């Protein structure tokens, strides 16, 4: 009887909601409107490339449509660094877009922090190489960080701090791991949001 009452109540609410919506005036097209796109993930990648070029790196745009599991993207960027490290060229591999994280643990972090941490093992022992990833709005997940940074010394530093990269990733606790080794990127709110950008620097 209770189920029947609530079912009838829900249908009644739905009926009146639809009735009121259908009685509203249809929105009219606005006149004298100009729409301009003032920022995009492509422009974010272009700006990242310009910054890298100013530092003497040759930028390579991998994609501005990055959309996969964060740890897979990080592992891939780490492998790119490993492949090209020591080749005598200063290269900056850039990937823009937005990755995802499927939660398996109870830790703290965000997709950019997880991406960076996932690259740490591939970079282990390398000199003058790093991977970092940041959210353009200055916020990554439910944290105060914009993203994360790892280099050839990160994995050893994590081990010394009693942390294992793979166990940390399984617990989705990239924030505390990177915090322990100075790998968090903190920018504060930027006032914009055009996805994320990840950069792998190689020498």
Residue ranges and their predicted role:
Residues 117-203:
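Internal helix-turn-beta structural module
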Residues 64-65, 97-99, 134-137:
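Short, ordered loop/turn segments at secondary-structure junctions
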């Amino acid at each position: 009887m209770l189920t029947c009452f609530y079912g009838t109540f829900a249908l009644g609410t739905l009926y009146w909601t639809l009735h009121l919506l259908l009685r509203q005036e249809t929105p009219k097209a606005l006149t004298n409107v100009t729409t301009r796109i003032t920022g995009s993930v492509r422009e974010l990648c272009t700006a990242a490339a310009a910054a890298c070029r100013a530092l003497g790196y040759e930028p390579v745009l991998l994609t501005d449509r990055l959309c996969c599991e964060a740890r897979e993207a990080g592992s891939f960027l780490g492998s790119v660094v490993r492949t090209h490290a020591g080749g005598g060229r200063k290269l900056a591999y850039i990937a823009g877009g937005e990755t995802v994280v499927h939660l398996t643990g109870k830790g703290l972090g965000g997709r950019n922090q997880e991406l960076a941490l996932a690259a740490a093992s591939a970079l282990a022992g390398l000199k003058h190489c790093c991977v970092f990833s940041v959210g353009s709005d200055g916020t990554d997940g439910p944290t105060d960080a914009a993203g994360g940074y790892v280099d050839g010394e990160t994995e050893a530093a994590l081990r010394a701090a009693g942390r294992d990269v793979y166990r940390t990733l399984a617990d989705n606790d990239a924030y505390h791991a990177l915090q322990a080794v100075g790998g968090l990127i903190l920018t504060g709110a930027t006032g914009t949001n055009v996805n994320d950008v990840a950069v792998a620097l190689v020498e």
